[in-house]
């Protein structure tokens, strides 16, 4: 019922690091009835011929879905590398391209990379080399490229991410053990037959409380220097 001819993109969100049911979502956009309803309004949409699935995987870097890392199940997946995420570059993100044929993902990547640096055909490092002064501006881009220092921070964390992820899992399971038998607690999913979380956030829910009671609980927890958010 939520899909109409105006629907161009579905954006599933991996809340707290637990992957969505991507097999069902991808099957939905391929259903003949849904594809027949799709009304393209651009050449790219016409070429795809169906609704695009772009996963908000900001929380789920390192999660697993059917034995594969998150980011590999949808047309496009976007990770966050913000300061509070499992892997950080202080600020920034990463985009995974899995567009189907006839799209060329390498070509799409090159276009996206070009756009992040004002559509300049050479980056600052390349321009500093002998003969590198000759370059062009080939379009209307943006200045959103990641600085080398930020990228270096991210690369260092990627190299030790398996260790970081194991520690997050340890903490998550400790919370789970503490709350599992509490009748008032709704604990978050972590691992099923086909999914495993990135253990980004322990999203605990408490049954039958008001907003005021929730806020009071958060204030009490904060007194113990434990960060809590809604």
Language model features: what each stretch is:
Residues 2, 96, 178:
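Conserved catalytic core of Hanks-type protein kinase domains
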């Amino acid at each position: 019922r939520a899909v109409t001819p105006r629907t161009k993109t579905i954006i599933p969100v991996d809340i707290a690091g637990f992957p969505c049911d991507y097999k069902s979502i991808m099957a939905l956009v391929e259903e003949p009835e849904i594809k027949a309803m799709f009304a393209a309004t651009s050449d790219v949409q016409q070429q795809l011929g169906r609704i695009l699935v772009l996963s908000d995987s900001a929380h789920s870097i390192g999660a697993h879905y059917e034995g594969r890392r998150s980011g590999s199940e949808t047309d496009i997946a976007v990770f966050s590398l913000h300061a509070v995420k499992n892997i950080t570059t202080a600020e920034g993100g990463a985009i995974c391209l899995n567009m189907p044929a006839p799209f060329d993902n390498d070509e799409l990547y090159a276009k996206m990379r070009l756009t992040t640096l004002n559509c300049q055909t050479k980056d600052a490092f390349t321009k500093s080399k002998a003969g590198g002064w000759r370059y062009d501006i080939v379009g209307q881009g943006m200045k959103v490229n990641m600085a080398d220092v930020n990228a270096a921070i991210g690369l260092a964390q990627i190299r030790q991410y398996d260790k970081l992820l194991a520690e997050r899992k340890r903490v998550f399971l400790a919370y789970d053990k503490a709350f599992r038998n509490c009748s008032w607690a709704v604990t978050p999913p972590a691992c099923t037959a086909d999914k495993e979380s990135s253990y980004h956030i322990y999203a605990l829910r408490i049954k039958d409380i008001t907003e005021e009671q929730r806020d009071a609980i958060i204030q009490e927890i904060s007194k113990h220097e434990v960060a809590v958010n809604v």
